[in-house]
A protein has these predicted regions:
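Glycine-rich FAD pyrophosphate-binding loop
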Residues: 22-46
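Short hydrophobic core segments
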Residues: 6-8, 169-183, 197-198, 250-253
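N-terminal Rossmann-like FAD-binding beta1-loop-alpha1 element of flavoenzymes
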Residues: 3-30
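A conserved short coil-to-beta-strand element within the FAD-binding core of flavoproteins
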Residues: 129-147, 152-158
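Glycine-rich active-site loop/strand segments that organize a redox cofactor
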Residues: 48-96
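A glycine-rich dinucleotide-binding beta-alpha-beta segment and adjacent secondary-structure elements
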Residues: 128-130, 323-379
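An anion/pyrophosphate-binding glycine-rich loop and adjacent beta-alpha core
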Residues: 35-37, 42-43, 51, 57-58, ...
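Short beta-strand to alpha-helix junction loop
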Residues: 71-81, 99-118, 128, 184-188, ...
């Protein structure tokens, strides 16, 4: 039997929810408060939109930082290969890049949105832009199977539609809330869904940053703005307690550090574990042990023994980083390499292996509150 379903939110999740609900034979209305659909998609992946990852689906769970079991049915119900097939079948070919990252062949996130819009049109989904939902509509229902004489009859809320910001009521047999979180207010992610979920009886946890860059207090970071490092390792500590370590890519910004490895760190570090300011240690040469790196530096110094120090480490570091490392080492940049002491060389070695910086480092609906597996709130 066909149902009238309202989808709140026109991002990637909302558009896909609307498509599949319509494909099941339902009449769908998609409500989006912005002037266009997929506003956040436009800026995803630096404007290229990293759609998914082409790894084995089991690997995806390893990158879910908490409660990965909650996503088993979702991942296997519409896995990464299905995502790729969906977009290619709607006129958007994809390519797989380093790290199994999947992008549109065109490198344009707008093509992702166009493919989703074609899919919605194909299923005759009604799309209403500039339409903001203020709250859900409910009616109380009582479990009729309960003993008529019982005093603790079970009462639930049945959602019957939505109220728009202008006061208009829209009736529906079911409502799908796909508003996103509180991550990027200028794109429409203003946390509306949290209030709706809370009103529906769900537990909403405290919101804290996740998948975000880190601010770094050291001034030298600003001079490295735009520098991207690959094959680098980081370790993050709160006092003596190690909270996170990883290997991969990072990017220096005007305020600190970002990049895949840093974003993953921000998602992994629980605020409850942070008892004092964080310290991050960057290993610029993780493939080499300290002893092996020392030998490498000695070889470079031997080849450049008559050169000034500032001209001797260009094979070891990106050009933009050399002035920073020289300053932090405390070695006179004009000093001849053959005059550098073992103590000075050891200081340089430690900067390569443990470049230290201080940094400032997730929320949503609690998936452990017993209300999610198999529950749909009569939506």
């Amino acid at each position: 039997m066909s149902k009238k379903i309202i989808v709140v939110g026109g991002g990637a999740a909302g558009m896909l929810a609307a498509y599949f609900a319509a494909a099941a034979g339902n009449k769908i209305t998609l409500l989006e408060k912005n002037e266009k659909l997929g506003k956040k998609i436009y800026i995803t992946g630096k404007g290229r939109c990293n759609l998914t990852n082409a790894c084995d689906v089991e690997e995806l769970f390893l990158n879910v930082k908490s409660n990965s079991k909650f996503l088993y049915s979702a991942f296997y119900g519409f896995d990464n290969s299905m995502v790729i097939d969906f977009f290619e079948s709607h006129g958007m070919p994809v390519k797989v890049e380093r790290g199994n990252r999947v992008f549109p062949v065109s490198d344009k996130s707008s093509d992702v949105i166009f493919a989703l819009q074609r899919a919605l049109k194909e299923k005759k989904v009604e799309v209403l832009l500039h339409t903001e939902v203020s709250k859900l509509c409910y009616e109380k229902i009582t479990d009729t199977k309960a003993d008529e004489e019982a005093t603790d009859k079970k009462t639930e809320l049945k959602i019957t539609g939505v109220i728009l910001k202008d006061g208009t009521k829209m009736d529906a047999d079911a409502v799908i809330v796909a508003t996103g979180g509180l991550s990027y207010p200028s794109t429409g992610s203003t946390g509306d869904g949290y209030k709706m979920a809370e009103d529906a009886g769900h537990t909403v946890t405290e919101c804290t940053p996740s998948l975000v860059p880190f601010n770094v207090k050291e001034e030298w970071v600003k001079s490295l703005q735009g520098l991207s490092l690959k094959n680098t390792a980081i370790s993050i500590y709160s006092g003596k307690k190690k909270l996170y370590e990883d290997f991969g890519e990072m990017l220096f910004t005007h305020f600190g550090v970002s990049g895949p490895m840093i974003l993953s760190a921000s998602a992994s570090i629980k605020q409850s574990l942070i008892k004092q300011p964080l310290d991050m240690y960057i290993d610029l040469k993780p493939a080499l042990t300290q002893e092996a790196l020392d030998k490498r530096i000695l070889r470079e110094f031997e080849e450049a023994k008559n050169k000034q120090f500032k001209n001797s480490i260009n094979k070891l570091l990106p050009a933009k980083m050399i002035p920073v490392i020289i300053e932090l080492s405390g070695i006179d940049p004009d000093k001849k390499v053959n005059e550098i002491s073992k103590e000075e060389r050891n200081r340089l070695l430690m900067l390569f292996k443990k470049l230290q910086s201080g940094c400032d480092c997730c929320a949503g609906i609690d998936c452990d509150d017993g209300k999610y597996i198999g529950r749909r709130d009569h939506l």
